[in-house]
């Protein structure tokens, strides 16, 4: 599947350079290029999630993410990712498994293991707009959203974000996919600031259907690691 991440994805984004000059690229070309980043055939990431409430109280959650690509029936790749929470003690052993199928007609398969209950909960497609482990991220923010569900347009073809020149691109569900897209994401529309140099999402915002609020995403601590542009810090605020 070709996907984009409203939140830039929890495992970071990597550089992919499409053919053609910047002037020739359409908004769809750019979002497809963001999706087609090289991230290797397998990866292991150590992450820390910090939840901050309205009283500025913080809760820290440490997790490790394992991701691996497998050959698909079409000759492309299916991706399986396992997120394993290591701390704090009350959620240690909680695991989230996602199968991202190459077949665009097939929805992701996702499961959440809750050790305190010793049960596995299947995440239905109608639940992917729910909060992921009490955070401002949803399952859809983490898994990604189908590019083909959306029409993309330029809001601004040149805008600076922290000194980085970006395209500002808006995503609105196509009429034929509107109900499915809104159910899966909980968003009526999204906007992304994409770096013209690295094709990383520097900033994003999503209009929530519930509560009529806007969710804001910000990427920071961007580093070139082993010739790969990597986002090391990602913030979501609702």
Please name every model-derived segment:
Residues 7-17:
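Bacterial N-terminal signal peptides
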Residues 23-116:
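N-terminal mature ectodomain segment of secretory-pathway/periplasmic proteins
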Residues 17, 22, 237-238:
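Short, intrinsically disordered, charge-balanced linker/junction segments flanking boundaries
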Residues 9, 26-30, 230:
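Alpha-helical structural motif
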Residues 54-57, 72-77, 104-106, 160-164, ...:
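Short, solvent-exposed loop/turn segments that connect beta-strands within catalytic domains
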Residues 1-5:
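Positively charged n-region of N-terminal signal peptides that target proteins for export
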Residues 64-73, 151-160, 220-222:
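Short amphipathic beta-strand and strand-loop transition segments with alternating hydrophobic
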Residues 32, 86, 97, 109-113, ...:
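Gly/Pro-enriched, hydrophobic low-complexity segments
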């Amino acid at each position: 599947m070709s996907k984009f991440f409203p939140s830039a994805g929890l495992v970071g984004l990597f550089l992919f350079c499409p053919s053609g000059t910047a002037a020739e690229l359409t908004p769809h070309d750019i979002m497809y290029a963001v999706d087609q980043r090289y991230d290797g055939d397998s990866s292991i990431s150590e992450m820390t999630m910090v939840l901050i409430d309205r009283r500025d109280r913080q809760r820290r959650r440490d997790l490790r993410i394992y991701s691996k690509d497998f050959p698909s029936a079409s000759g492309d790749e299916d991706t399986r990712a396992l997120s394993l929470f290591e701390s704090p003690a009350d959620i240690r052993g909680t695991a989230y498994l996602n199968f991202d199928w190459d077949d665009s007609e097939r929805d992701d398969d996702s499961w959440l293991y809750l050790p305190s209950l010793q049960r596995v909960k299947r995440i239905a497609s109608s639940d992917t707009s729910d909060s992921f482990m009490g955070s401002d991220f949803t399952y859809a923010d983490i898994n990604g959203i189908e590019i083909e569900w959306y029409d993309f347009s330029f809001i601004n073809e040149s805008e600076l974000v922290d000194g980085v020149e970006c395209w500002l691109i808006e995503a609105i569900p196509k009429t034929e996919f509107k109900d499915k897209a809104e159910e899966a994401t909980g968003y009526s529309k999204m906007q992304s600031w994409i770096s013209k140099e690295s094709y990383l999402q520097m900033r994003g915002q999503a209009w929530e259907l519930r509560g009529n609020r806007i969710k804001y995403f910000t990427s920071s601590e961007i580093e070139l690691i082993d010739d790969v542009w990597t986002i090391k810090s990602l913030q979501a605020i609702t």
